[in-house]
UniProtKB/Swiss-Prot annotation, chain A:
GO terms for biological process: GPI anchor biosynthetic process. Pathway: Glycolipid biosynthesis; glycosylphosphatidylinositol-anchor biosynthesis. It is a multi-pass membrane protein. It is found in: Endoplasmic reticulum membrane. Pfam families: PIG-F. Belongs to the PIGF family. The chain crosses the membrane at residues 45-61, 74-94, 111-131, 138-158, 169-189, 195-215. It comes from Eremothecium gossypii (strain ATCC 10895 / CBS 109.51 / FGSC 9923 / NRRL Y-1056) (Yeast). This is Glycosylphosphatidylinositol anchor biosynthesis protein 11. Keywords: Endoplasmic reticulum, GPI-anchor biosynthesis, Membrane, Transmembrane, Transmembrane helix.
UniProtKB/Swiss-Prot annotation, chain B:
This is GPI ethanolamine phosphate transferase 2. Its EC number is 2.-.-.-. Pathway: Glycolipid biosynthesis; glycosylphosphatidylinositol-anchor biosynthesis. It comes from Eremothecium gossypii (strain ATCC 10895 / CBS 109.51 / FGSC 9923 / NRRL Y-1056) (Yeast). It is a multi-pass membrane protein. GO terms for cellular component: endoplasmic reticulum membrane; plasma membrane. Keywords: Endoplasmic reticulum, Glycoprotein, GPI-anchor biosynthesis, Membrane, Transferase, Transmembrane, Transmembrane helix. GO terms for biological process: GPI anchor biosynthetic process.
Length: 217, 806
């Protein structure tokens, strides 16, 4: 019900969007920090829970043969696009509007994601990944992370680079990777301790947490 | 420092020391030599099964090197195994799997204690001597047998030279040599085999171990080395009669990286083969029956019959009819009972009596009992004895822990009540909690460097995200930290081939350029403000450089020509007299000159400060201290001090702009993190094996003082930690409003909580498999950190400097 009210109310207030006080008292959750004006935010709703990630992680941990990261990434791509189209985009509010899916931007943000793998890989190496060895695997990890952040990248592009609000989505993926590193030094010698499998799972869990709860923060 | 803090610190140190004294007791050993106990007269009259023994110890000979298809290239041994003239075993070698404790096990049959592993490092120590301990070597010697020994000089350290009629030791110090260590041994063989004027011939080959250390278990040098050893075995086999027993064994195994010391399957599974022409006329061991060698891969390197390495001792003693050494835990290897004929039962009962006496158990009169049940009982006793090889002094353990918990509670109270709630104190508490809990996991102790890295990236990431205005400094800091991480391998699990240190070793010209740059940058720091002091620093830096190149020349490393000209020029200037000096003779006077010059500069500066109080005293002395630390660092690690300089300036920048309110508190916490991280990335680990002794003898002549060497060793291994500790104090003096004692509470909190949890972990895990290979070394390192960094640097040196600074 609320979802329908907001677009209706928006039309009245759109000319006042410069007026912070009005738009804040009107529609925004009280304690939400403002990111640019008009504000961009993700509604607090169960709609953003990434169920596909739960299934995918389960499949990756239990049923993928030998933890095939490549295959997992291939599977992840359509899931993420669908997630963006059906769940994340409808929940994202741009200056009090909910925008329709922009198919051109979908492709552009896909390319952006692939380009982002290079700086992402650089960051992963800076944060301690092996250098010169296993670069292919590190690249695969950064590709996976970038695909995981695809909805957020799309939204950043869609909102004229208002990184401020979507920063936490990227951070939650990074924190997921970081926490999962704890599994690496253990001397259990399990196949899943191989680089970069723990980090892939960590990134998925981080993304899961991020897409579910970041709108609440 | 205030009285309260000093008191707490002393109590903390005392508690840890008390604990350590209870934890590392000298093992009780039975004195005296064994005599036959059971039917002594009959036994004395027995004929031994063999007349002569040839023992070939091949260092780090893992079981699969001897037996496994595609791995082993001991073709002749395989042939003998198939003919039944050789009996193969996999011998479990009790950790710590390093040579000295293992040799003790092989000769005396006793389980090693942890002190032996430490003494393995201390080359010149003589307290591990087995002169007064019963072993089959001493039994042979007492029975008038002639023993000849060639190989690793650890044997000569263990046994008095009069045991060996002839000996030639090779030093295992230069691990990079694969060939000469072994040809040095083999060259004696033709003479020995021709004259046969010995009863026992012991050969200890080191080459295989060296190959493992250098290139891992699958190194390309392994197959030729196997063939070389195989040829040695064939040579001996061909020239001895069938009254000679040839035994080939590894003292321990190795893991796939080629290291050893721990308790993994690879490290503890050593190969053992008994070879004699006579053996083919006896039934071969059941596990070897119908098996064709080389055999296929087995899980955990378990090939053929599995025995304990110490079982070698009673077996040899029985076969050669000598009394079983008193402290032996070994159980006679059942397969050999057929060689003893009708006396087998006698010998096993003898072994039973000896073992029960060691276990201080009453022995029921065993006469014609069933051999199998007796052997089974002996195995049980052996297992119990091996587990309780060390007797902990529980009173001292609990006194230490109790005292430390009181101290920790007091420190925690003082710290928490005085700390303001800010990022620095939260970080400190988080680090303390994390490190404290990590000591309960053996892999986290082994891979502690990963935890510190994990913490530092979290801190940088957090700080970057919350203070985006300092992005360039954060990036610089991160790049430097990553360089530091890539400089050396640490821990046990991951060994990367392309570390910066390895690259620099293979490109000496770049290395020496970087060393020059480092020394110049460090020495000329603050040149514009105090040119005179900088020139003095430069002088010290120059001396340091000359010494380092000179050292490289002596040790066969490559140094560039400009450095060599510099050395010649400097030396003709310094040590006038015109006669050309040998580089080797120069080392000691050069190092002494360096230390004298630095001491003089420090004294001058202190005297100057006593007259004209200058606030910048500490930051002005800092470069000179850094040069001293550089002096004690291996040359491939020296450029890291350049990295540190950059890191320090970017860190100061971040703290100045991003954390103006808690600048010094933050620096103290980060200093603690960086101390540990850089200690590990200099190549240190929590294992005894990586203690670096190369810089411990700088300026030390032959009749040296052990305490000076110890101090130099500590500084050499802890140089980066001292650097960061001093760096924090420099900033403290310049910018802090708090007193040093108050500031110090945070690291006291860390050390006391960390120590307490480690002591608790040691008590909980005292019967854990890894107690000697992981937890005990960690306890030693904790002592080292406590004494050197926490006490000497941060409680003696730094307050003194602060006092002079006024």
């Amino acid at each position: 019900m609320t979802t329908k009210k907001r677009p209706v109310g928006k039309k009245k207030f759109v000319s006042f969007s410069d007026d912070d006080a009005l738009s804040r008292t009107g529609r925004l959750p009280k304690n939400l920090p403002q990111h640019g004006s008009p504000p961009v935010y993700v509604r607090r709703t169960w709609q953003t829970i990434p169920f596909h990630l739960i299934v995918l992680s389960y499949w990756f941990i239990k049923h993928s043969n030998g933890y095939d990261v490549r295959k997992c990434t291939w599977l992840l791509v359509p899931c993420q696009v669908l997630y963006l189209a059906l769940q994340f985009n409808p929940a994202t509010v741009y200056g009090n509007k909910i925008l329709k899916l922009n198919y051109a931007l979908l492709a552009v943000s896909g390319v952006t994601c692939i380009l982002l793998t290079i700086p992402c890989m650089l960051l992963v190496v800076l944060f301690g990944a092996p250098f010169l060895e296993m670069l292919d695997k590190t690249w695969l990890l950064s590709l996976h992370c970038c695909v995981l952040s695809y909805p957020a990248v799309y939204s950043v592009l869609n909102s004229d680079f208002k990184v401020g609000f979507f920063k936490k989505y990227f951070i939650s993926i990074a924190v997921g990777c970081w926490i999962s590193c704890l599994a690496i030094p253990l001397d259990w010698d399990r196949p899943w301790q191989e680089w970069p499998i723990p980090l892939v799972v960590g990134a998925q869990l981080g993304a899961m947490f991020g897409y579910t709860f970041c709108s609440q923060l | 420092m205030r009285f309260k803090e000093v008191g707490l610190l002393f109590c903390q140190l005392l508690a840890v020391l008390i604990f350590a004294a209870g934890f590392f007791p000298q093992k009780k050993v039975l004195k005296g030599d064994a005599q036959f106990q059971y039917m002594a007269e009959t036994q004395r009259a027995l004929e031994p099964a063999f007349d002569k023994l040839v023992l070939v110890v091949i260092d780090a000979l893992r079981a699969d090197f001897l037996f496994q298809q595609n791995v082993s290239h001991f073709d002749f041994v395989h042939e003998l195994l198939n003919r039944g003239e050789a009996w193969g075993f996999t011998a479990y070698s009790n950790p710590p799997t390093v040579t000295l404790p293992r040799l003790k096990g092989i000769t005396t049959g006793s389980a090693p204690n942890f002190l032996d592993a430490i003494l393995n490092v201390a080359e010149d120590d003589s307290s591990s001597n087995l002169k007064d301990q019963d072993s089959w070597i001493s039994q042979f010697a007492k029975h008038g047998k002639k023993i000849h020994f060639f190989g690793d000089d650890t044997w000569l350290k263990l046994f008095p030279e009069e045991f060996f009629q002839k000996h030639d030791g090779t030093n295992s110090f230069f691990v990079s040599d694969f060939e000469e260590v072994d040809t040095n041994v083999t060259r004696h063989l033709p003479h020995e085999l021709q004259h046969k004027d010995w009863d026992v011939l012991i050969l200890h080959y080191l080459g295989l171990d060296h190959i493992g250390h250098k290139g891992g278990a699958a190194s390309q040098f392994m197959p030729p080395k196997h063939r070389e050893m195989d040829a040695v075995i064939r040579q001996i086999y061909d020239q001895v009669d069938n009254r000679t027993l040839l035994c080939v064994m590894g003292d321990h195994g190795m893991n796939d990286l080629g290291n050893h010391g721990g308790s993994s399957a690879g490290e503890t599974s050593a190969g053992m083969v008994f070879i004699s022409k006579m053996l083919s006329s006896y039934p071969r061991p059941a596990a070897q029956d119908g098996v064709s060698s080389p055999v296929t891969a087995a899980e955990d390197y378990q090939f053929f019959t599995r025995i304990q390495q110490v079982d070698f001792v009673p077996t040899i003693a029985s076969l050669f009819n000598i009394p079983i050494p008193k402290n032996s835990l070994g159980v006679f290897v059942r397969e050999f009972s057929s060689l003893l004929g009708q006396h087998a039962t006698t010998k096993i009962i003898e072994n039973y009596h000896q073992l029960m006496q060691l276990a201080a158990k009453k022995t029921a009169a065993r006469g014609n009992d069933d051999i199998d049940s007796m052997l089974a009982e002996m195995k049980d006793v052996q297992a119990t004895l091996a587990r309780t090889a060390t007797n902990y002094n529980y009173a001292m353990l609990f006194l230490g822990v109790g005292m430390l918990s009181i101290v920790t509670a007091a420190t925690a109270y003082c710290y928490i009540s005085s700390a303001r709630l800010n990022e620095a104190s939260v970080l400190m508490i988080a680090v303390t909690a994390l490190l404290g809990s990590s000591v309960f996991g053996s892999s986290f102790v082994e891979e502690e460097h990963q935890i510190w890295w994990w913490i530092i990236i979290a801190v940088v990431g957090y700080s970057w995200a919350t203070r985006p205005s300092c992005t360039p400094s954060h990036l610089v800091f991160l790049v430097c930290a990553r360089l530091l991480r890539g400089w050396n391998n640490s821990g046990q699990k991951f060994m990367y081939d392309f570390t910066v240190a390895e690259l620099l070793k293979s490109h000496p010209s770049i290395k020496w350029l970087l060393v020059c740059a480092t020394l110049a940058v460090v020495a000329l720091d603050g040149f514009t403000e105090r040119p005179l002091l900088s020139i003095f620093n430069l002088l010290a830096g120059l001396l340091c450089f000359v010494y380092k190149t000179c050292w490289a020349n002596v040790n066969g490393e490559v140094s560039p020509t400009y450095a060599q000209t510099l050395v010649t020029k400097a030396c003709s200037l310094l040590f006038a007299g015109g006669t050309p000096w040998d580089d080797k003779q120069l080392l000691v006077p050069l190092a002494r000159l360096f230390f004298k010059v630095t001491a003089a500069i420090v004294c001058m500066r202190i005297a100057y400060n006593v007259v004209f109080a200058k606030r910048k005293f500490l930051s002005e002395l800092f470069p000179l201290f850094t040069i001293v630390l550089i002096m004690q660092t291996a040359s491939q690690n020296i450029p890291l001090f350049l990295v540190f300089t950059i890191m320090r300036s970017s860190l100061r920048n971040i703290l100045r702009v991003g954390y103006p309110q808690q600048r010094c508190e933050m620096f103290f916490v980060l200093s603690l993190i960086l101390q540990n991280l850089s200690f590990f990335q200099f190549g240190g680990t929590n294992s005894i094996a990586t203690i670096d002794l190369t810089n411990s003898y700088n300026g030390i002549s032959e009749n040296y003082n052990i305490y000076v060497v110890g101090l130099l060793m500590c500084i050499g291994n802890m140089a980066p930690a001292i650097y960061w500790s001093l760096a924090a104090v420099v900033d403290h003096q310049l910018y802090s409003k708090k007193s040093y004692a108050q500031q110090k509470l945070s690291s006291m909190f860390f050390y006391s909580v960390n120590s307490l949890l480690l002591l608790v972990a040691c008590i909980c895990m005292r019967y854990h498999l890894f107690i000697w290979s992981v937890f005990s070394p960690k306890l030693c390192y904790l002592l080292g950190w406590n004494i050197l960094i926490h006490f000497l640097t941060e409680t003696v040196l730094e307050p003194f400097l602060l006092m002079v600074a006024g």
